[in-house]
């Protein structure tokens, strides 16, 4: 379970940042 001190918006924000970083890294690997 997620901590009750973490708002759902914060989790969504971190998830979006993680997805963005993951996509950028994948693009770098694909471009090599």
UniProtKB/Swiss-Prot annotation:
Protein localization: Secreted
Primary localization: secreted
Bias (Polar residues) ranges: 20-32
UniProt-listed Gene3D superfamilies: Apolipoprotein
Keyword terms of this UniProt record: Lipid transport, Secreted, Transport
Tissue specificity field: Hemolymph.
Chain segments carrying region Disordered: 1-32
Disulfide cysteine pairs (residue numbers): none
GO cellular component, one term: extracellular region
Assembly and oligomerization: Equilibrium between a soluble monomer and a bound lipoprotein form. Apolipophorin-3 associates with lipophorin during lipid loading until each particle contains 9 or 14 molecules of apolipophorin-3.
Family note: Belongs to the insect apolipophorin-3 family.
Name of the protein this chain belongs to: Apolipophorin-3
Organism this protein belongs to: Diatraea grandiosella (Southwestern corn borer)
């Amino acid at each position: 379970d997620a901590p009750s001190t973490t708002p759902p918006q914060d989790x969504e924000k971190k998830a979006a940042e993680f997805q963005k970083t993951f996509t950028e890294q994948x693009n770098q690997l694909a471009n090599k």
